[in-house]
Amino acid sequence: MNRLPSSASALACSAHALNLIEKRTLDHEEMKALNREVIEYFKEHVNPGFLEYRKSVTAGGDYGAVEWQAGSLNTLVDTQGQEFIDCLGGFGIFNVGHRNPVVVSAVQNQLAKQPLHSQELLDPLRAMLAKTLAALTPGKLKYSFFCNSGTESVEAALKLAKAYQSPRGKFTFIATSGAFHGKSLGALSATAKSTFRKPFMPLLPGFRHVPFGNIEAMRTALNECKKTGDDVAAVILEPIQGEGGVILPPPGYLTAVRKLCDEFGALMILDEVQTGMGRTGKMFACEHENVQPDILCLAKALGGGVMPIGATIATEEVFSVLFDNPFLHTTTFGGNPLTCAAALATINVLLEQNLPAQAEQKGDMLLDGFRQLAREYPDLVQEARGKGMLMAIEFVDNEIGYNFASEMFRQRVLVAGTLNNAKTIRIEPPLTLTIEQCELVIKAARKALAAMRVSVEEA
């Protein structure tokens, strides 16, 4: 028998949640009750699969620690009052830290004025953010489309490329093996993991994948497409593959791809959703090779870990296909005043505190420590790699990676794997992580590996 809707039940549940939001602290019994509720509601109303996914942070059979609040810029606190150094960074959203006061203040001040735009009148912050990004991004990137997430920014990039290249008879897209560009239908067509793709086949036609970092494979694909009349509209890739396992291409790869795009008349789309906003030691990872894309995708850290926002920035030549009809691609909430306030404040913090340079310095320190551990534990660790504050430790098998995440959780350091490479644990902390916290992370990793070796020897 179908369950009947209950206004009384919905009202009670929402009132209970609002009461929790208003409380600054919870006592021990309230914390325990909240844990039970959250686990039950995830199981019954969100997705029980998420509980199994969080098995590396299982505590006392509770499936996962329940997050309660930020502890400081670089830590978070669970409902048990335990504080964790954040080396996951919400998959790359906390570049300026948790609840950065500059970002929070900007959003609060805008909230006091007007949280969402009317849609009909011109909204000032969208204009100011677009101008700021035009100044900040490399090359001739000039016009911005704002949305709510990384996958939406990729969708916009693909549609822009299609609209620009269709009159030229170019319809094919080339992406790379191991790529992750999102899970909406268009972005998923560029993503390269079968687990995510197969349930939704057939995906959009016209997408080909070549090995990442192999410039000859890219040239061959462009040549073959030209020979068969399947001319390439755009090449889409990440400067560093994040979900693929933090895979760095050979030096000069992006430069060579840019030259091939120019040679074959293809647009270059760079997905910097994870590598952008200072993460790799430059504001944008493409700046390490002074490469200028035709379209740039941003999201994650753009909202300062406070608001969700994505952006697709393109050259005037490409973006002009939307000039005659700006309603060809729009979104209700994209570029709203609250998200734009957060993004403007985030950029201000990144620049004023020179966080990209800090990411390079502290990233080198962390990576040196992880590489030393790889030399000390070759039976467990295959490799440590990365750039700036985007790093990965790859283990010899999947289970060891899971065990490492669990041991780090016991050491009160939060890490997690990557979506496309189960052997790899990602290290992606806030760029505001202190030197002392960097040292604590390395120390925790050493303790975790030592405990794992003992477990292996005793097995």
From Swiss-Prot:
GO terms for molecular function: diamine transaminase activity; identical protein binding; putrescine--2-oxoglutarate transaminase activity; pyridoxal phosphate binding. Its cofactor is pyridoxal 5'-phosphate. Pathway: Amine and polyamine degradation; putrescine degradation; 4-aminobutanal from putrescine (transaminase route): step 1/1. Pyridoxal 5'-phosphate binds at residues 150-151, 274, 332. The gene is patA. InterPro entries: Aminotrans_3, Aminotrans_3_PPA_site, Class-III_PLP-dep_AT, Putrescine_aminotransferase, PyrdxlP-dep_Trfase, PyrdxlP-dep_Trfase_major, PyrdxlP-dep_Trfase_small. GO terms for biological process: L-lysine catabolic process; putrescine catabolic process. This is Putrescine aminotransferase. Keywords: Aminotransferase, Pyridoxal phosphate, Transferase. The keyword Transport does not apply. Its EC number is 2.6.1.82, 2.6.1.29. The modification N6-(pyridoxal phosphate)lysine is found at residue 300. It catalyses: an alkane-alpha,omega-diamine + 2-oxoglutarate = an omega-aminoaldehyde + L-glutamate; putrescine + 2-oxoglutarate = 1-pyrroline + L-glutamate + H2O; cadaverine + 2-oxoglutarate = 5-aminopentanal + L-glutamate.
